[in-house]
């Protein structure tokens, strides 16, 4: 009987669905595993990146179910976002219709691959019920002071007509549409992620060896903790008159280099720069260039060529009394430190590059034979008055102490991470649950009025905010004074939705109507035991999710400190050496692969072609190879004896049979290591192939039966449909269970022993593993007879299973 993938897969998907095989059990006393792959945006079709991600997660979920764990393996859709509005403009379809039509199609695709997702806990973040509790969380954060409003320069995408977080600007362009991003001053809501900066940094330590080092490093750098000295610099008298300021605050992490300062660099937004602009004390050329710098995103400023302009004013060095020129520079950010940086060109690469470009003084204050800039924090100070000959660290501490004693400076800790702006000027997002009242200012909506839903009668044109233009939707009553007011017309950044969905999944779905999170089930299921997704989310979703977990804990919603215990970042799926994309014409449609070869073939290829963390190059021949392997497995199963397993006696097997059985059990042993630690599914599949090849040389009916029983068990998480089919056909099994290793299989028939005389190796021999110590010693003497001739043995040493040492004289 030929292998018919479509019939087998549809049969088992129906059985699994009807019997709710993949729903988590209600018994919260069972050992649990929460396996979660990052949920998709409903773009309309799944792609091969999705197939790889979800196949990895599904293999783990199926394995842990099989060995007795209560498994939560949910899926949902990150369904708000700009693409729905873009589709509305392009195809003249409502964003909601476009989104939910896509969700329906993608559900069908996902389940056609046999993924063992919980259907009862499936959600879309655009569902009103999800929005209701997201708005509740927003209000609780606002009341706790974790969300606030301010007017600030924001990253503005002209194409999408919306604000972007710093993390969403890539090389000066919008991460979503690729359009140039400009700076624009706007009011908005901000999440106070900086309040958790220290905790976010410190708690990375608990994730070491469980998260990829690259992700940990990226988060450390993004949080960017620096400890240093904040101090005042007085302006000289003439400069005070021009700048309308008497001093400025400066921050440095290198107080030991204080005597090497040759200029101070200010951010364009610094108050002194703005005062000079207001008084028209800077020429038009400088004015234009300052505006150009202000229009750059923070990331652009720090990555572009260093540029600056002398402001014509000076500060006084607080220790030496020397005059220091003040410059405006593009690499200084207004919201880091004080927006002013003391520049030490001799000991900082950026400052050195700037000083060389503008011919500024370079003052060496650390002794070194190396070329400047010398940036290491090692060496003795020079040209630093009473601090000469001190090493850098000692000098740094003493200089800070002197500043504190003179009351002109203090030790401070700064972080690079900025508060997260979450206001977006778009329609298809969760409405921000706030109102604007002329009498009361801004105020949160009453919880009983949630969810604040979107109006459906809108015109999506791509110009401006549709909610702002709606004739009636904004009108409301102020919850404080009862007067007429207006709803906030901005919607939330979609990363807000994906920052807590994992906790919603962990809540018993029977409680979803009543509460955001069910304490009992969340306490049981969280944290996620294994999270799987792309490394591109390292400082976006993963950082926000970690913040949300801590904030929700402090708000009393849950108890765990971190959302994800272990993280696997899978590599991209490439074709012709490039990421699959329609523009490159190198897309492979999963539906076509499933139709031609079946879901199991697609799954097998995804896990066999490369280790999960590495990039995977699509290969049509390798897909064919995966299909042939399944066909061969199916064909060979037709010759296996059906019925109950016959017990095998290891001692009754011949050499070839023992070897084949050993290979089968080695694969079973490897499965434990692969599923629990390495995720090297490719090596596990290879081990199964090796076992089947060894088995082909044997004609032992009982051995073949046992081997197939074990190999189907090993491969079930990877190619579940065909394994369930063959297991039912051969063994009347409709489910899989944990298998135990048989230690006697691993016992070697022969021992390879070395013989040493007076510690020097003289011979090697093979002997039966069942031989006694006396037999082994006799055989050792026989093999070394020529060295023993005329000698007497004074001591015989046998190290079991390894060597014999004879001491002679």
From Swiss-Prot:
It is found in: Cytoplasm. It catalyses: tRNA(Leu) + L-leucine + ATP = L-leucyl-tRNA(Leu) + AMP + diphosphate. A motif ('KMSKS' region) lies at residues 579-583. The gene is leuS. A motif ('HIGH' region) lies at residues 40-50. This is Leucine--tRNA ligase. Pfam families: Anticodon_1, tRNA-synt_1_2, tRNA-synt_1g. SUPFAM superfamilies: Anticodon-binding domain of a subclass of class I aminoacyl-tRNA synthetases, Nucleotidylyl transferase, ValRS/IleRS/LeuRS editing domain.
